Amino acid sequence: VALDLTEEWKNLAGVEPVQGCIVVRKDYFEQNKTAVRLFLKEYNAAVDYTNANQAETAELMAKYEIIPSAAIAEKAIDKCNIVCYRDDAMRTAAEAMLQVLYDANPKSVGGAMPGDDFYYNDANK
C-alpha cells in the first residue's frame, strides 16, 4: 500500500475518516422513531456481522451481484474499515471531518459548522 488514507486522516483529524452516513429528516424521524431506531440497530448488527464473518459476507455479496467474485469481496472487506459510529463517537468523527472541510473552505459545509440539532444521539433519548 503506497498510502494508507485511513492513517493519514487519523494523523490530520485525530479520528478515523467518515466515509458514509445515514441522514434522516427531523420530521420523518419524529413520525417514525421506532422504525429509525430499529434500522440503526439492524445496521449496527450488519456491520458487526460483516466484520466477524467476512467469508460468509463475501459469498452473499457475490450471490446478490454486489461484487462479481466472493474472493475479491473478501479481500476488499478486510481493507474497508467498516464501522458504525453512534451517538458521541459518531458526532466526534463527523465534527472532525466537517472541521477539516470547513477549514479548507467554509462553503463546503454551508458556511458554518452544524449545530447540536444536526446530530442524533440515541444515548441521550
Report each predicted region and the residues it spans.
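An extracytoplasmic/periplasmic, membrane-proximal ligand-sensing/linker region
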Residues: E56-K125
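Pocket-lining segment of extracytoplasmic ligand-binding domains
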Residues: V1-M61
